Amino acid sequence: PLRLVGSEMCIRDRAKPTEIETRQIYEARKAIENSVIMILVQKHQNNELDLRGIDSLVKKEKSLHQDTDNAKLARLSCDFHLSLAELCDNKFIVESLKPLIPLSALAASIYADNESNFCSFTEHFELIEAIKSNDLVKASKAINSHLDRCVESLDFNLKATKNHNNSHLFN
């Protein structure tokens, strides 16, 4: 379980990462997820990687995106990134990434720009295809571009005045 209570991101009993913290969260994710991609491309080259479960997640993401079920979509997007890490068979990578995923989802729920047409399932699909192509450079560009777009889709000028119910991010 994720604990935000002891972190400095709590303001009046409500978690709210700042712009700088959000950018740092994504910077840390890039460092970890680039390692994930490197391992997965190598495993795929050695025929040691089964991506059927990940393919299924992306298909579910696409169908939920069309139904606009944001809570389930957010959960699936989190599951996608953690599932990729789990395919590395390295508990330290998974445990390093685990707290960052919900923190980035929390930031997205606070700073979401409703004008943005960001669509993660297409980038998730492109990332999987890059891994399947055994092209590490292409796969690294795909994950970096995806995480950069996640940050670019946020509007840090928004005032977080709504009482966000973010419980779905931590279930």
Residue spans for each PLM region:
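Single conserved hydrophobic/aromatic residue that forms the stacking wall/gate
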Residues: 1-6, 10-11
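Minor-groove-contacting beta-hairpin "wing" of winged helix-turn-helix DNA-binding domains
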Residues: 12-16
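Conserved amphipathic alpha-helical segments that form helical-bundle/coiled-coil interaction surfaces
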Residues: 20, 25, 29, 37, ...
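Short amphipathic alpha-helical signal-transduction/dimerization elements
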Residues: 36-37, 41, 132, 151
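Charge-rich, acidic-biased intrinsically disordered regions
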Residues: 51, 103, 108, 133, ...
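Active-site loop of classical SDR/Rossmann-like NAD(P)-dependent oxidoreductases
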Residues: 116-118
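C-terminal effector-binding regulatory domain of bacterial HTH transcription factors
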Residues: 137-171
